[in-house]
Amino acid sequence: MLGLLGGVGGVGLLTLAGCGGADRPGAAARTPGSAPPGPATTATTGTTATTTAISAADCAPFPTETGGPFPADGTNGPNVLNQAGVVRTDLRESFAGLRGTATGSPLAVRLRVLDLDAGCTPRRGIAVYAWHCDGDGRYSLYSAGATDQNWCRGVQVTDGDGTVAFTTVFPGAYPGRYPHLHFEVYASAASAAGGPKLLTSQLAFPE
């Protein structure tokens, strides 16, 4: 369980499934070397999504993992979290005055935040910041040829079902890494602009 500040104790982010584009398998997993994946709560293929109930017995905290060297959260250079337009569903385009589109196959991602201290009930109003490389393995704001872009980055706030959804592109693999997506969890959209992180972790998509 997470030790969270401000009375938001016991928030767990579960593995969600499926993240599937038109030509991608619909499965998500923890990064190599971490604990085995927990039960999938959401399956997404193309534009169709199904949700499976999670029992309290199956509910488990998500492991903390590195945010990597390209977070653009102000800890290593640029910070998109204080820019207008960062709260968005579609991550494929750059925003805040930048123009550009990420390369890669379409990908739909759904994440669900559950309260472990309340019988694994959904948490409304939690902010999730997600980022990843494009289909060519480039990180916006950091990689050569992409320093003037901020695609594949954005924040969503959980709905009444504890869910956030992103439309993006399938991240490319690069030496030593499976395709993967990083995320940070904050108590609210306002706290994402400088407040404490409740969780930093990532999902891997073995091809």
Show which residues each predicted segment covers:
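N-terminal export signals
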Residues: 1-20
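A generic signature of intrinsically disordered, low-complexity regions enriched in glycine/proline
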Residues: 10-13, 27, 119
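Serine/threonine-rich low-complexity intrinsically disordered regions
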Residues: 7-9, 24, 55, 88
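C-terminal segment of N-terminal export signals and the immediately downstream linker at the start
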Residues: 15-79
